[in-house]
Structures are given as structure tokens and as C-alpha cells.
From Swiss-Prot:
Catalytic reaction list: 1-(5-phospho-beta-D-ribosyl)-ATP + H2O = 1-(5-phospho-beta-D-ribosyl)-5'-AMP + diphosphate + H(+)
Hydrolase as UniProt keyword: yes
Gene name per UniProt: hisE
Primary localisation category: cytoplasm
Pathway(s): Amino-acid biosynthesis; L-histidine biosynthesis; L-histidine from 5-phospho-alpha-D-ribose 1-diphosphate: step 2/9
Subcellular location: Cytoplasm
GO BP, sorted A to Z: L-histidine biosynthetic process
Domain of life: Bacteria
Family matches, as Gene3D superfamilies: MazG-like (1.10.287.1080)
Protein family (similarity comment): Belongs to the PRA-PH family.
Disulfide bond keyword on record: no
A Pfam family matched in the record: PRA-PH
Protein name: Phosphoribosyl-ATP pyrophosphatase
Amino acid sequence: MGESQPVKTFDALFDELTERARTRPEGSGTVAALDGGVHGLGKKILEEAGEVWLAAEHESDEALAEEISQLLYWTQVLMIARGLSPDDVYRKL
């Protein structure tokens, strides 16, 4: 049987991205996206949302999960750019 990859939670990803934003490692795509601002992040989220929709209509569950993970990543980067925490979002669920 193949090895399964470790599971990363929403909160663990947020902590990882927050640390990247704080330490600003050279060459980080997350840092570059944050430096690009909210407008660019919003455009990226719209792009990823469209890819989620298309994957849901035409691709495998695995491809859909991949697209959803990318949408979650970009949503979290936008949250960091705006100073929101997961708890800010959880209170709205």
C-alpha cells in the first residue's frame, strides 16, 4: 500500500502562513503575494474559485480536492493580508 501524506489542518496551514508573513523568507511565494496586496489576492481567489467549479463539473474527486486546497491557501493569505484570524471566520460559521 502507498504511504499517506500527513494531514495539514486549516489552523496548521494558517500558522505556517502567518510565520512566513512574519519571517519573510527570501523567495517565498506567500510573501510575494502579500506584497502584491489585496487586489491581486482577490483576483487569485476568483481564479481559484473558478477552477474549483470546473473541477467539480469535469474532473476527479482528487483534482477537485487539489483545487479546493488551493482556494483555501489563497483565502488564508488574504485573511493574513487583512489581519483576520481563523477565529474571526469561525465566529461567522
